[in-house]
């Protein structure tokens, strides 16, 4: 087992594709990505470093049944964390959003995931500058940085590889 676990929630498959790209770039440092609806808390907790991906749905929701998805996802998983401690875990988020279609809650689905994990003691890393995006509001901002890597596969797909490479270099410097 590698030291880095990659987990994702998805509705359209775009987040899964990014998770696979991350795995390809990390190679043996990370295990193959797993959809969060296909894992257990024990499997999740087995990794000291977690890279977690989520899209933003509707008005800023995480994927899951309450957001209209056909299967469980992040919404249900974080509800099941209950009193689990993530102390000693290092976590970085990557989020997908559509800044033109949803400018009022761009990548806001990252916020509930960030809050749930940090409240349970996780060391959150991998924030990302908000420069180069055009949106009105996002709850995923802390100052002028997002709580994780932000990718817009709808409008800026041509920037994904460069953003991903830069973010992963920062992650590797922090955890290796």
Curated annotation (Swiss-Prot):
Cofactor(s) essential for the protein: FMN
The record, for Pfam families, names: Flavodoxin_1
GO BP annotations, alphabetical order: nitrogen fixation
Residue spans making up a coiled coil are: none
Q: Which InterPro entries match?
A: Flavdoxin-like, Flavodoxin, Flavodoxin/NO_synth, Flavodoxin_CS, Flavodoxin_lc, Flavoprotein-like_sf
Q: Does the keyword Electron transport apply?
A: yes
List each copy of the Flavodoxin-like domain by range: 4-172
Q: Name one GO molecular function term.
A: electron transfer activity
Q: Which Gene3D superfamilies match?
A: 3.40.50.360
Supply the alphabetized keyword list.
Electron transport, Flavoprotein, FMN, Nitrogen fixation, Transport
Q: Which NCBIfam families does this UniProt record tie to the protein? A: flav_long, PRK09267.1-5
What family is this protein classified in? Answer: Belongs to the flavodoxin family.
Protein function: Low-potential electron donor to a number of redox enzymes. NifF is the electron donor to nitrogenase.
Q: Entry's PANTHER family? A: FLAVODOXIN 1, FLAVODOXIN 2
Q: What is this protein called?
A: Flavodoxin
Which species does the entry assign this protein to?
Answer: Klebsiella pneumoniae
């Amino acid at each position: 087992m590698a030291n880095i676990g990659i987990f994702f929630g998805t509705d359209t498959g775009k987040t899964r594709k990014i998770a696979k790209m991350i795995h390809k770039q990390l190679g043996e440092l990370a295990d193959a990505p797993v959809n969060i609806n296909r894992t257990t808390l024990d499997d999740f907790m087995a990794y000291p470093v977690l890279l977690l991906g989520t899209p933003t749905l509707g008005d800023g929701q995480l994927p899951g049944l309450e957001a209209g998805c056909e299967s469980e996802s992040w919404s249900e998983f974080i509800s099941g964390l209950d009193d689990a401690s993530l102390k000693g875990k290092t976590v970085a988020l990557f989020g997908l959003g559509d800044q033109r279609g949803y400018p009022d809650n761009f990548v806001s689905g990252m916020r509930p995931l960030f809050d749930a994990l940090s409240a349970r003691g996780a060391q959150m890393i991998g924030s990302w500058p908000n420069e180069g995006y055009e949106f009105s509001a996002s709850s995923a901002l802390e100052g002028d940085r997002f709580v994780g890597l932000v990718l817009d596969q709808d409008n800026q797909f041509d920037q994904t590889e460069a953003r991903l490479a830069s973010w992963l270099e920062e992650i590797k410097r922090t955890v290796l």
